């Protein structure tokens, strides 16, 4: 059976342009939107392993921790209230991403980023001053609203601002910011946990104000994308901005294509309903399946619950937080590898290599934990070398994710949608991501209690399934201009039956013909 298709040669446009300091600055600032998501992932798992935090808000979990070593280690964190604390954010992000789609389309990408920063800042302040569990959950819900807006707008912003030759690397800046946010949070957790008096968790949770202010202030100074400006009728300003972004005077070909795509977009009255049309079947499939599979790698439970997990396998609180810092450092370093390789090696290669690496590591970790913990979850005293082996393979697993499904799970969906469905489709991507992050966060601690080490084998099974899916159905998108992506689907062995020549890209043909007519006239 043929694998994914590749588009090369004749039909492909090459818009003029270079990587200017201006576009680099705007993409770096916009990518900082990932800090708020990453900081939350890193900070929450850390504070839930701090005894003072658990004693104040989740006393039943704290009491389980204080029991002797005969306690089933798999089940010591199984608490409905603790689960609600962690997972409420993702449900809120799901709801806000649906609203953010309309805001992003009608008012621009920048305004959505601004809303995201403000809402996240409010949630961080409530959590930092929380005195009751309900305050923690309200704060988490506001954090989720902020993340929903930011995750909707930032990947679109980066894909639209970046020159097509550098789109992969610049878009992965979002994932790099997520990993940096995770690492910073884990380092802060390690030091704040040592504060006498047991109030360090307040600094950890309240510290989320800093990344929130970065994206809030950043969104005030950033320009909107030419695509978004054209979509809102600001043609002259968009052309001027496009010249500055690309660093060349002749942007007529790209501009005409953007205008043509915008005209087709404006002819669509119901973008949500339009997503169900046959010609958008490949886009809708990827918008759903890529974020679905991204969460079923198990990465968020590893990063989110890393301190809890390391505590479970025999580390002290300090050692578990430090081990989480190590995995966070690996996460950042491996994401840099992805930035280097995504526009050289392609998306498919990284997806498949990362999947293979994660599969091997999950099998090894399951075997190691199963051999020592058995099914009753009472390992006794773990040798230091044994714990180091487990952490090493978890780090290799994190690296495999960080240069594959981590960044590409945001990059590929954001670059494959035509303008007329782009905002709605990106909202689907964010919503699916948050739905399954919520579900997995909701059931992870219970699954760990019941499936024990077999939980890692469940995630390993899904890694096999998703790798097969990528091999068969995902075409290579490296080096294709964002408004020319229709070629990818028309050339694919399977998706070509849904996306026919006469059915897709008519607006771009109009733009091409308009550009040629203008050239002849001159």
Curated annotation (Swiss-Prot):
Recorded topology in the membrane: Multi-pass membrane protein
Record-level GO BP terms: monosaccharide transmembrane transport
Xref: CDD domains: MFS_STP
PROSITE patterns reported in the protein's UniProt record: MFS, SUGAR_TRANSPORT_1, SUGAR_TRANSPORT_2
A Gene Ontology cellular-component term: plasma membrane
Molecular function in Gene Ontology: monosaccharide transmembrane transporter activity; symporter activity
Claim: Membrane is one of the keywords in the record: yes
Extracellular side: 44-79, 139-140, 193-202, 311-321, 370-384, 449-452
Signal sequence residues: none
Modified residue annotations for Phosphoserine: 252
Tissue and organ expression note: Mostly expressed in young leaves, especially in guard cells (at protein level). Also present in roots.
Transmembrane segments: 23-43, 80-100, 118-138, 141-161, 172-192, 203-223, 290-310, 322-342, 349-369, 385-405, 428-448, 453-473
Job description of the protein: Major hexose transporter. Mediates an active uptake of hexoses, by sugar/hydrogen symport. Can transport glucose, 3-O-methylglucose, fructose, xylose, mannose, galactose, fucose, 2-deoxyglucose and arabinose. Confers sensitivity to galactose in seedlings.
Protein name: Sugar transport protein 1
Organism of this sequence: Arabidopsis thaliana (Mouse-ear cress)
Organismal lineage: Eukaryota, Viridiplantae, Streptophyta, Embryophyta, Tracheophyta
Gene: STP1
